[in-house]
Amino acid sequence: MAKFRAAAVFSSNMVLQREKNVRVFGTGKNGESVIVSICGNKAVTEVADEKWCVTLPAMKAGGPYEMKISNGEETIVFGNVMIGEVWLAGGQSNMELELQNCMGGKDFLANDKTENVRYYYTQKNCNMDEKFFRDEENTGWSCFDSESARAWSAVAYFYAKELAARLGVTVGIIGCNWGGTSASYWMSRESLEKDTDLKAYLDDFDNAVAGRSREEMDKEYLDYVKYEEEWQKKSVEFYSTHPDGTWDECQAYCGVSKYPGPMTPLNPFHATALYDSMVKRVCPYTIKGVIYYQGETDDNRPKTYFKLFKALIQLWRDDWGDDELPFMFVQLPMHRYKADPDWKHWCLIREAQMRTFKTVKNTGIAVILDCGEFNEIHPKNKVPVGHRLYLQAMHHVYGDNETEAFGPVYKDMTVTGDRAVISFDYAESGFDIKGDNGITGFEVAGADKEYKPACAVIDEDGTISVYADEVKKPAYVRYLWTNYGDVTLYGKNGIPVAPFRTSMNDEK
């Protein structure tokens, strides 16, 4: 029999979404009545299938308030409740990266006096056993202080801090992210089964576990966990004395890396693994929207990412019952490991992200091409990432048309003689060139699609002309079509020109 309680995402110090009907939900005994009240509002429902959910009317920003939830025998009381803005922070390690580990993080923790940002960290565990539910009971919302905020998402914190200051309300962040995860890990089996390309993510797992006993798979995974713990200790030793060491040198010292481990039910790194255990543990908590930073792990299937990402957005909108739910996401920055060739797979992920922005309603894209670090997949400066997400939200969600949220974004191409002329959206204020080498990163090709490095000049009408001596009849242009390269071209607002290619059918 289910115990009478509210879902773990409800606790003292929580933030409820302003100016939207607010869902409050939990578990209980079938047939019993549940009454939820806060600041003069009351809602009543009856438990069915050991679950209950009430909807409170929209409320204006304010607080602190007290929420009471009663079944007639027990009363749950949550204090210090604020009504403001609530955003879910989804994605993988660059969203997960903690405030204590970002550039300047220790100073922010010591000196910030942020009273109007709060955080709920969704438990990271895909194994929904008795321990899962015991541990979940110990989760709860926290207010900012130098200790509790150490593990907050740095990106989400900087985003929320600016948003709270601008709107004058408390902002709550629901952290729902995990490093090394594919978008497919955060989706349901049903959503992936709808499409042949997406079903491949399920097939990876289904084929790996076919014909194997649970006992055998659990032992294999737990053996891996022990190995990985020792391997990580050795890797810290190695990089402390070889900061510029290569991956091959690291493995020669530590042994072969087995990350992310065998694909088993206990391993969170497989399709659907985090949907029930994380997404559905906080859904349908009423939120304003989603901020999202992910895509690195999906570079093994970059040509499928547009379809995968679009399906994730639609699934989450369906789950939250809001087909207009805002989705502000980060386009991947520059990145390449020193030992790797330029596979250009991140180019395809970035292109899929821009295509998502251009074709999926109520989305925003934070271009952070200039925020990458060579040989480091986790750039430490998260302030500009949070800031550019904030700009996107102000522009798309909060209706501030004066906010310059974009750098220039490719619009179209015409050809004049031996020059390709590129026009841009969001380029009314013009361009800035940074560095001593002028504009770099453009390439041009003829009908043969053999790209050559190109010169680029800014025209008086705000277009950019691109040309190369070897290409007399330009047919295609691409810009910063590389996993890692110098970023020299920006809008006047300091946001870089987004990477592009003029033909998505060009596979070379």
Model-derived segments and spans:
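Cell-envelope and extracellular/periplasmic
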Residues: M1-K508
